[in-house]
Amino acid sequence: MLMDAVDKIGWDGKEFDNIPIDKEFIEDSDVNDHNLALFLYQSGYLTIKGSNPRNYILGIPNTEVRTAMYSQILPRLVKKPYQVVSSNINIIWNSLYEGDVEQAMEGLKALVADTPYSQDNSPKAMEEKFRFIVKNAMHLVGCFVDEEKQTATGRIDLVCRYDTCILVIELKMTENGGLEAAELQISEREYTSPFMAQGKPVYS
């Protein structure tokens, strides 16, 4: 049912947290098959987490719902069968658990490899899509993830905190310089420095 709605209504890969939605719209609408956020609310995937005079603020209620939701959605975003995505997630989890960060990153690369690139999307839009995919993949393996983490020298795309290590991730499409530009930005802006004193190995 969830994936049927995603396919029918469409989804740009943006996060479903802190979404404002008109109070009258949410109260007067029947089951909605045109607005994905409203559909997810009516299906129990989102809940009202706050309000203001005009809007309700929708968000994912808890970790269990987030895990259930994105374990279904990620296969559609990366255009791979559920079994393949599940295998990649298990590789990442096992590798991190065993302390093999390099192998974990290979599993992450395998997960996002061949993800369709739409010519209608700018490099920035595609970077946001990949950031969403990576963020939720890392969430599924048990990381606490900070997105667009602000530091004194810049803003880091993702900081993933695992039990035994911290991963600093910067994402750039080829049009924006790719891996070389991402590594240079991490180095020049010393993105790993703020986390060195936290008692865990820091990788980038």
Predicted regions and their residues:
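Nucleic-acid nuclease catalytic cores
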Residues: 179-183, 190-204
